[in-house]
Amino acid sequence: MASGSNVEEYELDVEALVVILRDRNIGRNPLHGEIIGLRLTEGWWGQLERFQMVRLILQDEDNEPLQRPRHEIIPRAVNPHTMFVLSGPLAELQLAFQDLDLPEGPLRFGPLANGHYVEGDPYSRSYRPVTMAETAQMTRDELEDTLNTQSEIEIQMINLLELYEVETRALRRQLAERSSIGQGGISPGASHSRPPVSSFSGLPSLPAIPGIHTRAPSPPRATSTPGNIPRSLGDDNMPSSSFAGPSQPRVSFHPGNPFAEAEGHRPRSQSRERRRDIPSAPVISAPVPSAPPMIQYIPVPPPPPVGAVIPIQHIRSVTGEPPRNPREIPIWLGRNAPAIDGVFPTTTPDLRCRIINALLGGNLGLSLTPGDCITWDSAVATLFIRTYGQYPLHQLGNVLKGIADQEGVATAYTLGMMLSGQNYQLVSGIIRGYLPGQAVVTAMQQRLDQEIDDQTRAETFIQHLNAVYEILGLNARGQSIRASVTPQPRPSRGRGRGQSAPEPSQGPVNSGRGRQCPAPGQNDRGSNIQNQGQENSSQGGYNLRSRTYQPQRYGGGRGRRWNENTNNSETRPTEQSPQTPRPIQAGSGVRGNQSQTYKPAAGRGGRGNQNRNQRSSGAGDSRAVNTVTQSATSSTDESSSTTTAAPSGGQGN
């Protein structure tokens, strides 16, 4: 037998097939790819009718004739009304179709494989249930499917028989009424009870009621009143018939019958009482009239319930479209399984199978059966094996490592539990090596040791992992949150003696030590920039209190004790030469200039004005001055300046 995927192929004898066709007056040759239905009239199962479907393979893919033609089994039900069918015993058809045998399950019933019995159809009339020989050759699942189909067919046959029985009883009742009318004893319009069962002979009898005995029909007796007593006079005795009655009725109108209704009692006739007083007359019991046949309607079993409507569009809006790469589908499904259960709970494997097949409708070869979808774990494991192939269990670590690098440890743990059949000891030992850092390993081990057993640890592993990630400042994949934040440039702050950072310039820098004075209205802008710089500086590193006032020895000066109105009203030079000392304005004292001029330290030759310009211009938020650089600069200035620089240096003290 040559097998291609799941199709069973066997050898074909074309010459024997041509002989079979000629024996049945079919004047043509078999065709390549032709599908033929085989009607097996008898075989090892007995003289019962069974069906099989085959397809002829006479050419290869290049349309060249095969040296050894083949036929393949098609697992579909044969429909003799729409396809070509060959009939014959199994031994004769096996001459052409080698290794021919019965199909699996209910397909052997042919047109009845779907369980629908068609009244009047010749193939439905030839239905016969499976025999013991067939049952012995079936597997458990195959036998269940066959018996389910067989029970559906036989239930329909029972319903038809019951309908036939009802029609038969109605015909009996009509026949009894016509026979009684033909004897002249009862008028069609008169009220009367049912005729005795003895009036129609030859039909099947009804069951007798216990306690009511039958009697032989009595001959007509002579009466004092000429003619027959009509039924309307109250005589319970029916005119006897020449036909023999087979049985007793179920219900009668006799007053002594316990089955009679209370309001249906008929009064005794006086003529009957007079006859009972005559001693010479033999006592003959009256026949019990028949009751109408009781029609019992057995309700037809309800149709199978329609499956639940799956909101596939709503589910797809939550999960998104499946990946185009089939190898990414198992991971995608395992990650979205909780979301699917949240949108539409899957309570049965059949429902879970329908949802998965609907989501993966465009991926051929990934369709699942309810047996593959008992749980989400089994469904994901089946898809993983179909896309990646069968893998040994000792390679599960390599599989989970790739998943952990791509999707994170949580996803790797979930899929590992699915692929290993909920083997917590194996998966936890593998996942432990993929945790990001010893701190996570220690914290996880401490939390898991507090659980009762492995089942509880397996259920709470993801919760503990997310909690540890949150404590350590990691994201869902175990990566640092700080690394994901884009660093923002910020102005530097003074960090003490001998340390300074480059400050971003916010305007053209003029030559020399002096800087351009800010225009009126820029003081507020400079203070805002300074506050923003302090806020930005507190984002990184340690969160320390900003230094609002620096001591004089660090270049902070004496604080904001000058009069801002006076400073705004005074005119200051916009640019100073590093070689020329700042002249003293007329009409202002030395102490007044010192208080109005921001001088950080003594002997620094006009640096106070420069520091004030730096703070008001908003070029930087730092009040620190590099003392080492300033000392070197001051010494150079003192050696090259004129004698007017000495008083200004002394005034700084």
Swiss-Prot record:
<keyword id="KW-1160">Virus entry into host cell</keyword>
<feature type="compositionally biased region" description="Basic and acidic residues">
    <location>
        <begin position="262"/>
        <end position="278"/>
    </location>
</feature>
<feature type="region of interest" description="Involved in viral assembly and export">
    <location>
        <begin position="37"/>
        <end position="60"/>
    </location>
</feature>
<comment type="function">
    <text>Involved in capsid formation and genome binding. Shortly after infection, interaction between incoming particle-associated Gag proteins and host dynein allows centrosomal targeting of the viral genome (associated to Gag), prior to nucleus translocation and integration into host genome.</text>
</comment>
<feature type="region of interest" description="GR-box 2">
    <location>
        <begin position="540"/>
        <end position="561"/>
    </location>
</feature>
<dbReference type="GO" id="GO:0019076">
    <property type="term" value="P:viral release from host cell"/>
</dbReference>
<feature type="region of interest" description="Disordered">
    <location>
        <begin position="482"/>
        <end position="653"/>
    </location>
</feature>
<dbReference type="GO" id="GO:0043657">
    <property type="term" value="C:host cell"/>
</dbReference>
<feature type="region of interest" description="Nucleic acid-binding; GR-box 1">
    <location>
        <begin position="490"/>
        <end position="515"/>
    </location>
</feature>
<keyword id="KW-1176">Cytoplasmic inwards viral transport</keyword>
<keyword id="KW-1035">Host cytoplasm</keyword>
<dbReference type="InterPro" id="IPR004957">
    <property type="entry name" value="Gag_N"/>
</dbReference>
<protein>
    <recommendedName>
        <fullName>Gag polyprotein</fullName>
    </recommendedName>
</protein>
<feature type="compositionally biased region" description="Low complexity">
    <location>
        <begin position="629"/>
        <end position="653"/>
    </location>
</feature>
<keyword id="KW-0694">RNA-binding</keyword>
<feature type="short sequence motif" description="PTAP/PSAP motif">
    <location>
        <begin position="289"/>
        <end position="292"/>
    </location>
</feature>
<dbReference type="Pfam" id="PF20673">
    <property type="entry name" value="Gag_spuma_C"/>
</dbReference>
<keyword id="KW-1187">Viral budding via the host ESCRT complexes</keyword>
<feature type="region of interest" description="Disordered">
    <location>
        <begin position="179"/>
        <end position="286"/>
    </location>
</feature>
<dbReference type="Pfam" id="PF20672">
    <property type="entry name" value="Gag_FV_central"/>
</dbReference>
<feature type="compositionally biased region" description="Polar residues">
    <location>
        <begin position="564"/>
        <end position="579"/>
    </location>
</feature>
<keyword id="KW-0946">Virion</keyword>
<dbReference type="GO" id="GO:0044163">
    <property type="term" value="C:host cytoskeleton"/>
</dbReference>
<feature type="compositionally biased region" description="Low complexity">
    <location>
        <begin position="609"/>
        <end position="618"/>
    </location>
</feature>
<feature type="site" description="Cleavage; by viral protease; partial">
    <location>
        <begin position="626"/>
        <end position="627"/>
    </location>
</feature>
<keyword id="KW-1188">Viral release from host cell</keyword>
<dbReference type="GO" id="GO:0075521">
    <property type="term" value="P:microtubule-dependent intracellular transport of viral material towards nucleus"/>
</dbReference>
<feature type="site" description="Cleavage; by viral protease; low efficiency">
    <location>
        <begin position="357"/>
        <end position="358"/>
    </location>
</feature>
<feature type="region of interest" description="GR-box 3">
    <location>
        <begin position="591"/>
        <end position="623"/>
    </location>
</feature>
<keyword id="KW-1198">Viral budding</keyword>
<dbReference type="GO" id="GO:0019013">
    <property type="term" value="C:viral nucleocapsid"/>
</dbReference>
<keyword id="KW-1177">Microtubular inwards viral transport</keyword>
<keyword id="KW-0543">Viral nucleoprotein</keyword>
<keyword id="KW-0167">Capsid protein</keyword>
<dbReference type="GO" id="GO:0046718">
    <property type="term" value="P:symbiont entry into host cell"/>
</dbReference>
<feature type="site" description="Cleavage; by viral protease; low efficiency">
    <location>
        <begin position="316"/>
        <end position="317"/>
    </location>
</feature>
<keyword id="KW-1048">Host nucleus</keyword>
<keyword id="KW-0238">DNA-binding</keyword>
<feature type="site" description="Cleavage; by viral protease; low efficiency">
    <location>
        <begin position="344"/>
        <end position="345"/>
    </location>
</feature>
<dbReference type="GO" id="GO:0039702">
    <property type="term" value="P:viral budding via host ESCRT complex"/>
</dbReference>
<keyword id="KW-0945">Host-virus interaction</keyword>
<dbReference type="GO" id="GO:0044383">
    <property type="term" value="C:host chromosome"/>
</dbReference>
